[in-house]
Amino acid sequence: MTLDVATIRRDFPALASGTAYFDGPGGSQVPRQVAEAMAATMTSGLSNRGAVTAAERRADGVVMAARQAVGDLVGCDPGGVLFARSMTQATYDISRALAKEWSEGDEVVVTRVDHDANIRPWVQAAESVGAVARWVDFDRETAELTVDAVREQLSARTRVVAVTGASNVLGTRPDLPAIARAVHDAGALLYVDGVHLTPHAPVDVAELGADFFACSPYKFFGGHHGVVVAAPELLERIHPDKLLPAADDVPERFELGTLPYELLAGTTAAVDFIAGLASEAADRRTRVLESMRALEKYEDELFGKLLEGLRGIPGVRLYGDPERRTPTAFFTVAGHDNREVYEHLAAAGVNAPASSFYAIEASRWLGLGDGGAVRAGLAPYTNEDDVDRLLAGVAEVAR
C-alpha cells in the first residue's frame, strides 16, 4: 500500500493558504473530517454521561467510541484508555498517584533526551517523598539513547523509568522493548512518552513493553487533549486524588471533571482518518497498522531528501544521527541566530520554528542552552515541493 499524498492534502483546509507546515511535531494540521466530527458532536444535543436520556447516551457513546479508537490506534485494551487535558497533566497526575507508594530512598529514572513533560513530573514527585531521580545521558554525536545507559541507572530501589518513544527534537527512537525488559527485570514500571512516536510509526503497546503509554491526539490530526493507556488491572492498583462523588471505576477515576466530548469525537475521527490513509482492510486496527507502515515508508523517503539537502548547505549543522528516528531535523545555520532563520522561512510561507520545544535538558546537553535550534518535521501532507521550499529558504539564509 502507498500513500496518495495529493488526495490526502485535499482533506486539509489549512493547506489552501499555500503554507508549508514543518511544525507538525508541535501539532498537526486538522483534516476536514475531524473538524466536522467535532462540530457535529457539539450540536448533536449532549448531557453529562448517563443511560436515561438520549443526550446522556450520546455523550457516553462518544466517550466509549474514543476509548475504542485509541485502543485500535495503539493496540491496547479500551478499558485502560484515560483522557486528560494534556499529556503533561496526565503525567503529573499519575506520577503523584504512584508516589503515594514510594519511600525515602526509592528511585525514578529519567533521560536527558525526553520532553520535560516526561521529566519534571517524575523529578518533582520523587522530591515530594524523599525519593531520588537518576539521569540517563544520550550520545551527543549520534543522539542515541542506549539500553546500557538506562541499565546503568537501575537498581533494586527503582520504581519508575520514564523514557521517550521518540525525541520531539532529535527524532531518536530508543529500543523500547529492550529497555522494557531491563526495567521489568529490575522490578520497575516503564512510562513511555509516545507523543512524538504515535504520528509516525505503527504502535503496539504490548510489543513495546510499556506499562504506561502517553500520546496527544493533536499531534495526529485530532483535538487538543492528552491520552494515557495502561492495563486496566494496573490502573486498579493506583488511587489518584479525586472528588468524593466522582466515579471510582477505571479509567474514570483518573479523569477529573467532565470530559471534552467534542475533542473525543475528534480523536475517533482522527483514528478513522489514519486508518483510511492507505488501507481497505476489514477491521480498523489492521487498517491503522497498514496505513502507518505506508506512512512511515513515505516519510522516511522524503526525510532522506530533506537530510541530504540540509547536509549540502554550507554552514548548516544537524544535531544527532540516530539509526532509528522519526522524520525530524534539528539544525542551526552558522553565523545566524535561530530566530533569524525561523523568521526568514516564515516570511516565505514555510513554518519551521526555532526553540528547545520543551526538550530543555536535551538542548542544554547538546550545548545549545535554552534556545535550542530550528526544527523541521514531516507529516503525511508534506510533499516534495514543501521540502524544496524549506531547503531554498535555508540556503538563502546561509549565503
How would you label these PLM feature ranges?
Residues 1-399:
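Pyridoxal 5′-phosphate
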